[in-house]
Amino acid sequence: MTTLQERVAAHFAESIRAKQEAGKVLVEPTVQAAELMLQCLMNDGKILACGNGGSAADAQHFAAEMTGRFEKERMELAAVALTTDTSALTAIGNDYGFDHVFSKQVRALGRAGDVLVGISTSGNSANVIEAVKAAHERDMHVIALTGRDGGKIAAILKDTDVLLNVPHPRTARIQENHILLIHAMCDCIDSVLLEGM
């Protein structure tokens, strides 16, 4: 029988392996995603972010790092999590269905050249899929953070979008990689803005 200590140690070991595997395929796409966001922000655009559950928390975490700061003081950057307005979420959910809680906001707030960060560990969240479609209608770029095989979201992305797919079957490991990717993108953005890299 496995002890609790062994279970915890196994989590650490699996998390390390999952990050190492993701690092083999996601360094270049992560840089592309950061550059896409930088281009948007330098042209007075904004970043909209969405997801469900833990991915909603990641969307909010990312928006907070942009509007506040990541690790260094810098100007505020325009980013909005579409997961925080309970009145909008419940009104849209009630009147149009939960699948549309993000897409209606994207259509209302998104403009050509803006970026949508859509987060879904399965790649199959219906409301994130609808948000991606709405972003495309608005001539926005999409950065999709997914897991497993990328799901339906990976299939509808355009060549100008960026897929950050964590190739792991376990949701916890995907989520841990998503926050690492978010922090890496924040660091890239700060490095360019503050150090001219």
Swiss-Prot record:
Work out whether the entry's keyword set contains Metal-binding.
yes
Other facts noted in the record for this chain: The reaction produces a racemic mixture of D-glycero-alpha-D-manno-heptose 7-phosphate and D-glycero-beta-D-manno-heptose 7-phosphate.
Name assigned to this protein: Phosphoheptose isomerase
Lineage of origin? Bacteria, Pseudomonadati, Pseudomonadota, Betaproteobacteria, Neisseriales
Protein localization: Cytoplasm
Oligomeric and partner information = Homotetramer.
Which pathway is this protein assigned to?
Answer: Carbohydrate biosynthesis; D-glycero-D-manno-heptose 7-phosphate biosynthesis; D-glycero-alpha-D-manno-heptose 7-phosphate and D-glycero-beta-D-manno-heptose 7-phosphate from sedoheptulose 7-phosphate: step 1/1; Bacterial outer membrane biogenesis; LOS core biosynthesis
Q: What role does this protein play?
A: Catalyzes the isomerization of sedoheptulose 7-phosphate in D-glycero-D-manno-heptose 7-phosphate.
Instruction: Give the UniProt family note.
Output: Belongs to the SIS family. GmhA subfamily.
Cofactor(s) required for function per UniProt:
Zn(2+)
Q: Which reaction is the catalytic activity of this chain?
A: 2 D-sedoheptulose 7-phosphate = D-glycero-alpha-D-manno-heptose 7-phosphate + D-glycero-beta-D-manno-heptose 7-phosphate
**GO CC, alphabetical:** cytoplasm; DnaA-DiaA complex
Q: Where is each SIS domain found?
A: 37-197
